[in-house]
Amino acid sequence: MASSSSSLLILAVACFVSLISPAISQQACKSQNLNSAGPFDSCEDLPVLNSYLHYTYNSSNSSLSVAFVATPSQANGGWVAWAINPTGTKMAGSQAFLAYRSGGGAAPVVKTYNISSYSSLVEGKLAFDFWNLRAESLSGGRIAIFTTVKVPAGADSVNQVWQIGGNVTNGRPGVHPFGPDNLGSHRVLSFTEDAAPGSAPSPGSAPAPGTSGSTTPGTAAGGPGNAGSLTRNVNFGVNLGILVLLGSIFIF
């Protein structure tokens, strides 16, 4: 009788685990409310800095609409930034959108920066066209940057860089921290179904500067490109455990 009760208990636990496993593997970005923004086709939990990217690729005009969500490193006066690097994989050469709160309950200010070197952070035009640029304050102290950028025709991925920083003085952002996460906040963003997750775009010449509009080893381990593999591994491990438990019931 005791053996039968133990078997039933094990079976009940196994069924419970199988039911909750999809919730365990679900991406956090899918539950985010982006206020007035429409739905995006895809989203990624970026691997560092508690940051998220929502995006939609439009092949008809080679554009990428994005919403970048992050929390500044300081509750008051901090900034967040998302960039595309047409010529490399890290910060130098990045074409960045940077947002910060100006105070008084107003919407965050968002500016563009052409980052020519690690020691230079000067506001200026970007090397590609963009439009519909804006920023919003979200719950939990987060800031969201929205924009649509022009990407090269036929491209299936871009090098994205993101960052969070501290104080902003007279509209000029301060230096960001130099911890491992801050230095590792760059990944390849593959935005078409045919893109190979591990292949980084080859650095080349930046496109000719466009007009700004009005007012996201290849992908490293643990990065956005491996999210699907992680989910599959979690579910496979759970299902294998269930099979082992069920087998033990019938054997004993």
Curated annotation (Swiss-Prot):
Give binding positions for heme. Answer: 91, 176
A GO term (biological process) for this protein? auxin-activated signaling pathway
**Could you say which residues form the signal peptide?**
1-25
Query: Which is one Pfam family of this protein?
Result: DUF568
Q: How is the cofactor bound?
A: Binds 1 heme group non-covalently.
Q: Does the keyword Glycoprotein apply?
A: yes
Provide the residue span(s) of the region labelled Disordered.
Answer: 193-224
Lipid attachment, kind GPI-anchor amidated asparagine? 226
What exactly does this protein do? One-heme-containing cytochrome.
Q: What is this protein called?
A: Auxin-induced in root cultures protein 12
Origin species, per record, is Arabidopsis thaliana (Mouse-ear cress)
Q: What is the lineage of its organism?
A: Eukaryota, Viridiplantae, Streptophyta, Embryophyta, Tracheophyta
Q: Which gene encodes it?
A: AIR12
